Amino acid sequence: MIGLGTAINIGLIIAGSLCGLAFGRFMKENLKQTLMIVSGIIVLLLGMSGAMKYMLVIVNGSLQTTGPLLMIISMVVGAVIGEIIDLNHWITVFGDWVKARTGNAGDPKFTHAFITASLTFTVGAMGVLGSIQDGLTGNYQTLLLKGILDGIIVMVMVSSMGKGALFSFIPVGITQWLITAMAHIAAPLMTPSAIDNLSYVGSILIFCVGIDLIWPGKVRIANLLPAIFMAMGLTFLL
């Protein structure tokens, strides 16, 4: 059944969040701060390992880099477009709207937790690749694995950052179902190279999310999102 993978992913995020809420109320503030740093380290390593998979190759027994030009152009042009549109502002507005609608207007951490968790779970290689596989073949195994990882990570995030991270299931559902639908409709454009490049830059953005978890406010990750689409488009130009 096409789209089932995202439904499972959403369910696991909600389950992990509820566990985080249950345990979080018994944690001291120092432990919550430490868990937030741990979340950042985990996300950093996930992003780094994903990017290295596409950046480094072994040729004739030696380690070489691949695709640096595509990565540089995608990140620079994507950042310029993102800053002009100011996606960070609009995602913050959406986060504030969700906060108000869910009765959490008094929670100062809600929007930051919502944005951070949403970006962590939507721009990664597993989400993109898994949604495309779901759309093309109905295979949801990658999204099932992603859901398990998301559930563990969101449990830590909710424990340390609050319930805003729980509602990340909304953009996760919207984004992954859209990718699944697009993959089902535009299958010829979903070439292996396009998917690899999209996943490559997406992993770099995951790394940036980890930086923001450890050093909040240093990177406006949402304004870098156009880089993902630039990477896919450049596949057919470079």
Residue ranges and their predicted role:
Residues 39-55:
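A generic, lipid-embedded transmembrane alpha helix
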Residues 8-16, 20, 24, 40-41, ...:
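Alpha-helical transmembrane segments in multi-pass membrane proteins
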Residues 1, 29-30, 87-113:
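Intrinsically disordered, low-complexity non-transmembrane regions of multi-pass membrane transporters
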Residues 2-15, 66-73, 131, 135-147, ...:
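Structural signature of hydrophobic alpha-helical transmembrane segments
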